Design a protein with these regions (language model features):
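A short glycine-rich, His/Asp/Glu-containing loop-to-beta-strand
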Residues: 15-50, 148-200
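Extended, compositionally biased flexible segments
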Residues: 29, 33-110
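Conserved hydrophobic/aromatic beta-strand scaffold that supports enzyme active sites
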Residues: 37-41, 60, 97-99, 119, ...
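Glycine- and acidic-residue-biased ligand/ion/polar-headgroup-sensing regions
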Residues: 55-83, 100, 176-177, 188-234
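Acidic/histidine-enriched, beta-strand-rich ligand/metal-binding domains
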Residues: 193, 204-205, 209-280
Length: 280
C-alpha cells in the first residue's frame, strides 16, 4: 500500500521521552516498510505497568536500563520472567532481552523504580516461533572486530542462529574517536536487495552530552536515496540504508548504538567473517 503526500522522517532527535510506549521509527512515520522501533519507559511513581500484544509480529524487548518482570502468554501457555535486566546504564554491562513470538500478550512491571526498554518488531505471520526466549548477559556473544582506527566491540544479541526468525539485533561500542560499521558489508553494493533490507540505529553517548557522526549513503527499502552526514546524540535514532553507514565517536565521547535490522542474508564482512561472523 503506497502512502501519498505523507511526511516521513529518517532521523529522530532524542525521540519521545514520555512514559509508556512511544514509537520512534516505524512504517507509519518513516521510510520503512516492515521494521518498527520504539521505547517503553516505566516508573513505579508514574506509569507503573505496560500491557501489550505482538499480533502477527516477532518482538524483541531489549532492556536498556533498570530491571523488570515480564509475564507472557499465548496458545503455548503462560510464562513469567522475573528480574530481567542488570544495567544502570547501557555502557555498564551486557544487555538482557526477551524475544516474543506472534500472537503473544505480555505485561511489563518494573522491579527497580524505573525501567527503559527498546522495542523492535517485524511481521512474521505463521513463521514465527511462539515460545518466548530470554537472552541474558551470559548468552550475548561479544566480539572485538576491525583494526586500527575502526576497532570496536560488538555485543551480538540476535544473530543468524538466534531464536528470532527475521529480526537481528545487537550493540556496538565505539571508543573515543574511532569508527565502526566499516568496511562495507558483503552485500552493501547489491542494490537488488534494498527492498529486503531495513535497519535502525539507536544511539547513546558517554558522557550524556557527547556526540558522534553518522554517514549514510545508499538506498532505503522504499528505494529512496540518501546521502548525508548527521550528528547523533544521546537518545537519537536513525534509519540506515543499504550501502555505506559508518559511525564515528566524537573526540570527547564514546558512542554505543543498538542496531535492529532485517535482511535476507547474514550481515558479514569478508575480511574477518571466518573468525568472528562480523556484525556492525
Amino acid at each position: 500500500m503506497k502512502h501519498k503526500h505523507r511526511k516521513t522522517v529518517d532521523h529522530v532527535d532524542r525521540g519521545d521521552v514520555r512514559q509508556g510506549y512511544q514509537p520512534t521509527l516505524t512504517p507509519a512515520n518513516a521510510p520503512l516498510r516492515e521494521l518498527s522501533v520504539g521505547r517503553i519507559r516505566l516508573d513505579r511513581k508514574g506509569v507503573a505497568k505496560y500491557a501489550g500484544e505482538t499480533g502477527g509480529n516477532e518482538v524483541l524487548l531489549h532492556i536498556l536500563v533498570g530491571q523488570c518482570t515480564i509475564q507472557a502468554s499465548g496458545r503455548w501457555g503462560r510464562q513469567t520472567f522475573k528480574q530481567l535486566g542488570e544495567r544502570v546504564d547501557v555502557f555498564s554491562g551486557l544487555p538482557t532481552s526477551l524475544v516474543l513470538g506472534p500472537r503473544t500478550t505480555y505485561t511489563i512491571t518494573p522491579v527497580t523504580r524505573t525501567v527503559d526498554i527498546a522495542v523492535a518488531s517485524l511481521p512474521v505471520g505463521r513463521a514465527g516461533r511462539s515460545i518466548p526466549t530470554a537472552i541474558r548477559p551470559q548468552d550475548v556473544q561479544v566480539h572485538t572486530i576491525g583494526e586500527g582506527h575502526y576497532v570496536r566491540t560488538v555485543r551480538e544479541v540476535l544473530g543468524g542462529e538466534g531464536p528470532a526468525v527475521r529480526l537481528r539485533a545487537g550493540e556496538t561500542l565505539n571508543p573515543t574517536g574511532l569508527w565502526s560499521s566499516w568496511p562495507h558489508h558483503d552485500f552493501d553494493a547489491n542494490v537488488k536487495l534494498a527492498p529486503q533490507f531495513e535497519e535502525v540505529f539507536l544511539y547513546f553517548t558517554k558522557p550524556r552530552g557527547g556526540w558522534g557522526l553518522q554517514r549514510r549513503h545508499g538506498l532505503y527499502s522504499s528505494l529512496q536515496q540518501v546521502d548525508d552526514v548527521i550528528v547523533v546524540k544521546n537518545g537519537d535514532a536513525a534509519i540506515l540504508p543499504l550501502g555505506e553507514h559508518p559511525v564515528v565517536a566524537g573526540v570527547d565521547s564514546q558512542v554505543l548504538y543498538i542496531w535492529f535490522y532485517m535482511s535476507p542474508i547474514p550481515k558479514t564482512y569478508s575480511k574477518w567473517a571466518e573468525d568472528l561472523g562480523g556484525y556492525a
